């Protein structure tokens, strides 16, 4: 069991680093606050457009597909981190770790197959996997009253 003095003696460098980093950030923020200019005009809240008057709204509507791509990136990035951690400790984990990683990869592949099957990865609506029954022209032509039946 280590005493408080031993813990402090062991971690003093990290404490100094942490205090220095927080102090430096605070010093930069205070310096910017005191040395920065103050705009008191009406144009203070208008974005700077390189000397050109801004036209229209700055808000832009993005397609939900971009959000899906961002979520997929985060999901697969976290999965890559797990696999990297496993690959670093492959000797310590042995066959049990290999089996766990294989199951993890199979679950990921099942999720990817599911995303492909529901069409979540399709960018165009024409390529979606939904089956829509298209009415045939012959069916409508035969039911039209002006077209004679054979």
UniProtKB/Swiss-Prot annotation:
Residue stretches spanning the membrane: 14-34, 66-86, 96-116
EC number: 7.1.1.-
Compartment(s) of residence: Cell inner membrane
Gene Ontology CC annotations of this record: NADH dehydrogenase complex; plasma membrane
InterPro entries: NAD(P)H_OxRDtase_bac/plastid (IPR023043), NADH_UbQ/plastoQ_OxRdtase_su3 (IPR000440), NDAH_ubi_oxred_su3_sf (IPR038430)
Membrane association type: Multi-pass membrane protein
Protein name stated in the entry: NADH-quinone oxidoreductase subunit A
Organism for this UniProt entry: Yersinia enterocolitica serotype O:8 / biotype 1B (strain NCTC 13174 / 8081)
């Amino acid at each position: 069991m280590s005493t408080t003095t031993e813990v402090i003696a062991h971690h003093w460098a990290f404490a100094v680093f942490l205090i220095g980093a927080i102090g430096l950030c605070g010093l930069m923020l205070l310096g910017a606050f005191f040395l920065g200019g103050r705009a008191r005009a009406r144009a203070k809240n208008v974005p700077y457009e390189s000397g050109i008057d801004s036209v229209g709204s700055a808000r832009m509507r993005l397609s939900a597909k971009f959000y899906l791509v961002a979520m997929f990136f985060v999901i697969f990035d976290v999965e890559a981190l797990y696999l990297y951690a496993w690959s670093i400790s492959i000797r310590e984990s042995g066959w049990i770790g290999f089996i766990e990683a294989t199951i993890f990869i199979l679950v990921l592949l099942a999720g990817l197959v599911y995303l492909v099957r529901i069409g979540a990865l399709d960018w165009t609506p024409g390529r979606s996997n939904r089956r829509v029954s298209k009415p045939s022209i012959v069916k409508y032509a035969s039911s039209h009253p002006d077209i004679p039946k054979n």
